[in-house]
Amino acid sequence: MSTIEDLKATVERLAARVHELEASAKSKIAPEVPKSIRMVLIGPPGAGKGTQAPNLVEKYCACHLATGDMLRSQVQQQTPLGVEAKKIMDAGGLVSDDIMVNMIRSELENNSKCKNGFILDGFPRTIPQAEKLDEMLAEKKQPLEKAVELKIPDDLLVARITGRLVHPASGRSYHKVFNPPKKEMIDDITGEALVQRSDDNADALKKRLVSFHKQTEPIVGYYQKTGIWKGVDAAQDPKKVWGDILKCLGQ
């Protein structure tokens, strides 16, 4: 009798050991690397780029290249391109397309967060910029895969943007009504203060929208011709917008 009980105990110990080994093997399997992404995010101020870009960064482990923030960062760090750009801006000029494209190239080559791809935000704004960007990416054998446009009526944008709050360091955006931070005027991630931009008022926005539409319609046409453009209704709830973006990206 004791022999049978001993055998049962041995079998149970072996089964437990097998279970431990299987669990250990699973834990050592390398985590799945997300699919890479190379895209442009197009949309007027207030369309939700600052809300959706962090979702894309987290989903694809890619870098968010908001060109305005990138330009400010390069100037602050006094990189060769930043120094050159500052001279132009101090003289009241516009930073050239070549400088902006080279800044993007620099980020792709030196920013470790860009290893799995990038989300470009705020560039290109003209067809010559789009062509220069395509040339640079072709040289690097990293062509754009998607251009996603967040589409939204202007009148809704005015309501949205006048309540917008921004975390300056990261570019994360919130809204007092539609997407409030957990704590009033405080960034959810860092605990740092949020700000409301001085140009986030109705009159300033309407002027920016006129400029945006004039610039962007040709860009949308450019990417439609190349076959990588997709449009998303950005007037929906942010979670629904996110789901539609993933569909555009084949997820």
Curated annotation (Swiss-Prot):
Any GO molecular function: ATP binding
Coiled-coil stretches noted in the UniProt entry, renumbered to this chain: none
S-S bridge residues: none
GO annotation, biological process: ADP biosynthetic process; AMP metabolic process; ATP metabolic process
E.C. numbers: 2.7.4.3
CDD domains: ADK (cd01428)
Binding of AMP, residues: 67, 72, 93-95, 122-125, 129, 197, 208
Reaction catalysed by this enzyme: AMP + ATP = 2 ADP
Region spans: LID: 163-200
KW Iron (keyword) present: no
UniProt xrefs under Pfam families: ADK (PF00406), ADK_lid (PF05191)
GO CC terms: cytoplasm; cytosol; mitochondrial intermembrane space; mitochondrion
Chief localisation class: cytoplasm
InterPro entries named among the record's database cross-references: Adenyl_kin_sub, Adenylat/UMP-CMP_kin, Adenylat_kinase_CS, Adenylate_kinase_lid-dom, AK2, P-loop_NTPase
Chain positions covered by the region annotation NMP: 66-95
Keywords from the named record: ATP-binding, Cytoplasm, Kinase, Mitochondrion, Nucleotide-binding, Transferase
Binding sites annotated in the UniProt record for ATP: 46-51, 164, 173-174, 236
Enzyme class: transferase
Domain of life: Eukaryota
PROSITE patterns according to UniProt: ADENYLATE_KINASE (PS00113)
Function of the molecule: Catalyzes the reversible transfer of the terminal phosphate group between ATP and AMP. Plays an important role in cellular energy homeostasis and in adenine nucleotide metabolism. Adenylate kinase activity is critical for regulation of the phosphate utilization and the AMP de novo biosynthesis pathways.
Description of how the protein assembles with itself and partners: Monomer.
Domains (record comment): Consists of three domains, a large central CORE domain and two small peripheral domains, NMPbind and LID, which undergo movements during catalysis. The LID domain closes over the site of phosphoryl transfer upon ATP binding. Assembling and dissambling the active center during each catalytic cycle provides an effective means to prevent ATP hydrolysis.
Stated family: Belongs to the adenylate kinase family. AK2 subfamily.
HAMAP family for this protein: Adenylate_kinase_Adk, Adenylate_kinase_AK2
Protein name (Swiss-Prot/TrEMBL): Adenylate kinase
Gene (UniProt): ADK1
